[in-house]
């Protein structure tokens, strides 16, 4: 490309111009904290080392319980809640930039809309693997909670559009017509 890439360290460094942003698998790269309530007590899921220096999951008491109850109402015992404060903070700052300069954003990610549960996973060579093994060799991720993202955007004054699956999004853009056009114009070798 004849256009140089400019790397920014923060949202505040964005120029004061209208924003058109596409975030593809951006939000799922942000850190997520997991919590579980057992017998009415909230605990945070952490990682620790055993005496042989093997990683394992453990649960430690959490003082975050008041916010968890507010965010998720009455949560059944032993259900996992995932909280991504960095995503909410990012959306808040990003919303302010859009409100000030106008613009829009499209975020594409593996996601859900407000469901509870453990979505933490590791992928290596297109296969799911143990997140605590082969450190640094796997893609670690959690599914994005788009309810939290849209709530944060709306709280900060933006309008959030309907959440769509990738399939429906592409169909709405006319992918079927495009595929049919391309197929009609294939030569014999390409078919």
Task: Outline where the language-model segments fall.
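A mobile, often basic/glycine-rich helix-loop segment
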Residues: 20-72, 118-131
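Conserved nucleotide-cofactor-binding alpha/beta core module
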Residues: 1-6
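Long, Lys/Arg- and hydrophobic-enriched amphipathic alpha-helices
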Residues: 67-191
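A short SAM/SAH-binding and catalytic strip from SAM-dependent methyltransferases
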Residues: 8-39, 81-89, 93, 97-99, ...
